[in-house]
């Protein structure tokens, strides 16, 4: 719910337990709801972090954006299903075709050596995923030229880049965006046929994935799982989710559109904010929630097929807005791409459960306490950002993904250091540019 923005006592003891209610899918073999919620374990010492910002971009593998980055695990070639070695080619960030990135594409690209789909990957099936009209030969075997994404490389050089970051889920954006708020998606897989969430009612369903990674029955694409937002409400913390709209309703990347409690309650109009550029207006007015998610418009998303290249400038502008604000010394920013988007990557995902891990994706960690120019090789996943939120604010763990996920605080941050002065990111644009763009 809407509430005054709260100054958090680091590692505060949570006084209220949040009810754990999973979507009922008992007809799915091997399906389980989220486990009983666990208390977060205090990591000891005081954290200066009062605000966590989770910026979610779209559909890029680590190798696609950071091929050749110093000290990071990348590769300039791959193999196809015929055993042929394929040299990676450069591909503009702005393109008008897309690559299949749902679960069938994951299983094909992985090319498993074992019976269980998506495990023990040979990582040679990228030529089998399928791509849209106009795609070139060897479409997936590509990287974006550094000059087109310089703000991302600049942020990495100044802060932290993780080269063993994986999506918690193995499929596309609808499920990925449940993991960024709930670390769980009720065994759902891929995306609904029409609306992406509760707006579609009981007729809008999504398929499920069983424990054996076979396709199960369908469920309504409107979930009732605990989220970071519901925990924050229970603990008196403020949160905001900035997203675009489609025909006046939540956009495809608006996670809480598929959350029954939020979509059908007051939070939908008070804490789910549009358009995304409103974040720039809010922080300019001295307003920043304890927990913030920012999803982009289509044009600023980095998503293939949209023929736009403004994503790097958008992210740089968001980081600059925080860095030049009064909140800089109390903020941690995570910039993550939600799924691999069909692009080649050489690092095999480790099997964790029915839905993960997915392929490797980039994440940037930005804070005055983030290590400078650090490439971490620790294995992280989408839910690691939620684990950071939980451990920072003393919240409960939501499900299996965040329970197993590593908190980046111990590895990527140094709270004993004096907060670093912010250095503006080249390529950022003023708020007025983004406000006008969204009109």
Model-derived segments and spans:
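Bacterial N-terminal signal peptides that target proteins for export
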Residues: 1-9
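N-terminal pro-sequences and low-complexity stem/linker regions of secreted or lumenal proteins
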Residues: 21-439
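C-terminal motif of bacterial Sec signal peptides marking the signal peptidase cleavage site
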Residues: 16-19
């Amino acid at each position: 719910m809407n509430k005054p923005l709260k100054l958090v006592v680091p590692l505060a003891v949570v006084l209220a337990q949040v009810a754990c209610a999973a979507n009922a899918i008992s007809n799915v073999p091997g399906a389980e709801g989220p486990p009983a919620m666990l208390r977060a374990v205090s990591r000891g010492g005081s954290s200066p972090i009062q605000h966590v910002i989770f910026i979610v971009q779209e559909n890029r593998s680590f190798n696609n954006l950071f091929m050749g980055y110093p000290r990071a695990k990348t590769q300039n070639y791959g193999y196809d299903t015929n055993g042929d070695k394929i040299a990676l080619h450069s591909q503009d960030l702005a393109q008008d075709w897309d690559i299949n990135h749902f679960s069938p594409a994951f299983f094909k690209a992985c090319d498993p050596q074992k019976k269980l789909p998506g495990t023990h990957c040979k990582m040679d099936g990228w030529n089998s995923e399928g791509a849209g009209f106009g795609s070139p030969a060897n479409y997936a075997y590509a990287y974006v030229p550094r000059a087109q994404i310089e703000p991302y490389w600049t942020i990495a050089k100044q802060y932290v880049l993780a080269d063993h970051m994986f999506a918690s889920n193995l499929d596309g954006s609808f499920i990925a965006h449940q993991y960024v708020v709930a670390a769980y998606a009720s065994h759902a897989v891929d995306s609904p046929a029409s609306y992406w969430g509760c707006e579609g009612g009981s007729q809008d369903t999504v398929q499920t994935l069983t424990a054996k990674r076979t396709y199960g029955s369908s469920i309504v694409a409107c979930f009732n799982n605990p989220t970071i937002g519901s925990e924050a409400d229970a603990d008196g913390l403020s949160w905001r989710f900035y997203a675009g709209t489609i025909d006046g309703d939540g956009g495809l990347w608006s996670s809480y559109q598929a959350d029954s409690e939020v979509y059908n309650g007051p939070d939908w109009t008070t804490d789910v904010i549009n358009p995304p550029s409103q974040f720039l207006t809010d922080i300019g007015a001295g307003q920043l929630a304890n927990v913030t998610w920012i999803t982009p418009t289509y044009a600023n998303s980095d998503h293939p097929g949209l023929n736009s290249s403004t994503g790097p400038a958008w992210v740089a502008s968001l980081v600059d807005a925080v860095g030049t604000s009064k909140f800089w010394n109390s903020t941690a920013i995570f910039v993550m791409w939600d799924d691999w988007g069909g692009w080649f990557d050489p690092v095999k995902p480790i099997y964790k459960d029915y839905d993960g891990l997915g392929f490797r994706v980039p994440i940037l960690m930005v804070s005055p306490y983030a290590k400078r120019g650090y490439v971490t090789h620790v294995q992280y996943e989408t839910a690691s950002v939620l684990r950071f939120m939980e451990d920072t604010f003393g919240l409960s763990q939501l499900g299996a993904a965040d329970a197993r996920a590593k908190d980046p605080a111990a590895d990527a941050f140094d709270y004993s250091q004096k907060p670093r002065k912010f250095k503006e990111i080249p390529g950022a644009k003023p708020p007025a540019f983004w406000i006008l763009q969204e009109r």
